[in-house]
């Protein structure tokens, strides 16, 4: 098997090698260049270790910096970012890039401050499980014609968006001192015809021109949607529209959320794919599985054990390295929240994604394991120019082990990526590995792989000007060139390690500090240093000056290499080494003091190797800690945690309740509502009745809609109503104030119909009112039939049964429609419930004395609606990060639509009859961790059985003493209630 694969790969390498030019710069800038090996920034090769981050899903700019610091600390040097058109444009011609979390300049500034690059992805179409795939909702009603083509109507709508956002991206390119290094065109757009006049080709050329007009000069990129086609590569049928850097999206896990035994099947054909599709370009995975989304009725993310497993990161991400990938973006690295009505119907409120960084911004073990790879790629410069020697099962003494073999042609460095051939295997296997080194062919003995484990074995690996490994069976975590060369290796507890220094023929003396016993054995190619990994940290000081840290995996998870530079490209002499705490955000060295900013849940050991004997004092979050110097030069002490903090979220006892569906009453004054009087729609989806009742045709897009249809006569026996508001969405109807039916919603139905029966006793001779209230779970993405993002929302058709016609229809949605009356929270935060329109969810609103003293636990007895409000105060310590959430519960069988508002932000859409989510976290800035908070809950029943909750409780997640500034005034993000809301009754 090895011979066949090696011959094939050598043939591909020969063909590619004769077609390659190096250091391509596309004529626009030399700050970012590329060749078939890697991207280069400012003349230095870069392993792009990136994570996907969507600022829309975290509407607190200060928390972006929190996330970026955590990513930087855990080995990432870049983020990939979607810019959603719909988040910034409430109406045609209007763009908001300044208000609150719409201020994307702050995104770029924080990225630069944290020391991470940005890959910009502005669409115009994004997908991303966000409503309408990121399109502006005002445009997603059919007026764009044939979307994602060269259609003139479509071009006229998206061009202003790309120009406006493109100018801001351009101003933040690396050429202008900013962090942007790549700019993506469109998203997963499959090239279906290699013809220059094809509409997709013309469309991609249009995008390129508009981005260029906006001033973009960094290389362009695109992301192929899996191995289904080859699209927009200059190396494959380039007839126009091709980008500079071709990329392939891959979500290969095939995992079951609740069955860890299923799936876990590696893809081992990436290298061949890229050699065929983009042989002059570096291998780029713009979206590689960092988790997976869950649908309505699916699973809670915290129960997805397989996706959350650090084993996934270990095996899959190292397999990518073995495939010679040098640009990798983890989708998602932090998912965040589909707050407001930002979700597409395929997902619920949480967008946790089982990502390495939890929705609550807490670090999962998966991120800790990912860090081991990120820190390794950061210092392993020889990895950035390798040839594929071969792959297969012939490199080891056990045919159950699969090997990727990479070699750097300039330095002879080798990287052997090992995993079980059957990647889902749970077997523990011990074997020897045959490698090629500068000292000749060598068999490295006693390598052990646990089940679902991967290792990168290095040979001829330089870790200092005069320090190198001939080989090591332990994995390299990182190294530092300080006063001495410091090498950091890791293994699982109980695994055997063996390493040999290059060009060190004589046996070195050494001293060991820790629980791991190291012995030396002279061989024909140098002295072997042999050990079995014990728990904890062991330091070994060699007589050649090298200091080696030997870590077990759990200790490696808490090992950091914080940079002393803000440059995303960190040289081995531009970081120090810290072991022990939960998080190290940053370090500075001032004279004799090393100042560390970090977080800790519990008090931990703290070991700092700064490489400078003048450094005698360690400060943790501004306070000096007691420390001592070890015999090998580090400083050790204790970093305080939060175990002493008493966290008791207040109970929610004092509620006010008001009717949030007064508009179901026949005498309700709807004279200021929007009249539905259109007889034709720009939407291509056929009408089921007249007038047009598509909510988007009247400027109401997100959230609940309320319709009131009038008719005369007592002979009507019912109505046939069809509604489309996304899967899982329900609706209910009232005739002259009395409930007459509806649909509770289902996870497999976006369009629902019901025949409503009218009791003749409810009818009047004139002016009967049928009120229909519809829930909303988002606009569809492009792939959903029949028309994707244009699939209309609201009532598709309504006809009377038994004779007669509706004489009029009126609609009410979010207050102001497209006017965007709350620009801070934006156009997709609210819907059309009366309480929302009146602003009862906003801070500063005071319920009148007439409001009932009732809570969601009391609920409602029939098909009604209530809006509940209360306030509470949090007094967390100023240096504490304590994510807070709201736990809801409802009696079995409850069918209702529940929304949660925290300080005006809709941060929970709870459907107890569908699920799965019942716990809703709030980030600092949405919730005031040191101040008063306004909590509102809207609830309306989908049946005449009524609805109530049986649990409404604030809960704390973890608690962390932090050096981040959580003691902030979030008032600018929480505009107060104003009495002008009354005009939207």
Curated annotation (Swiss-Prot):
Enzyme class: hydrolase
Keyword flag Glycoprotein: yes
Any GO CC annotation of this UniProt entry: extracellular region
Compartments in which it is found: Secreted
Xref: Gene3D superfamilies: Beta-galactosidase, domain 2, Beta-galactosidase, domain 3, Galactose-binding domain-like, Glycosidases
Single GO BP term: polysaccharide catabolic process
Lineage: superkingdom: Eukaryota
EC number(s) per entry: 3.2.1.23
Secretion signal, residue range per the UniProt entry: 1-23
Reactions listed under catalytic activity: Hydrolysis of terminal non-reducing beta-D-galactose residues in beta-D-galactosides
Binding site residues for substrate: 82, 127-129, 187, 251, 353
Covalent S-S links between cysteines: 257-304
Residues with attached carbohydrate: 276, 391, 434, 517, 602, 677, 715, 720, 759
Active site: 188 (proton donor), 287 (nucleophile)
Pfam families from the UniProt entry: BetaGal_ABD2 (PF13364), BetaGal_dom2 (PF10435), BetaGal_dom3 (PF13363), Glyco_hydro_35 (PF01301)
Purpose: Cleaves beta-linked terminal galactosyl residues from gangliosides, glycoproteins, and glycosaminoglycans.
Record-stated family: Belongs to the glycosyl hydrolase 35 family.
Protein's UniProt name: Probable beta-galactosidase C
Lineage: Eukaryota, Fungi, Dikarya, Ascomycota, Pezizomycotina
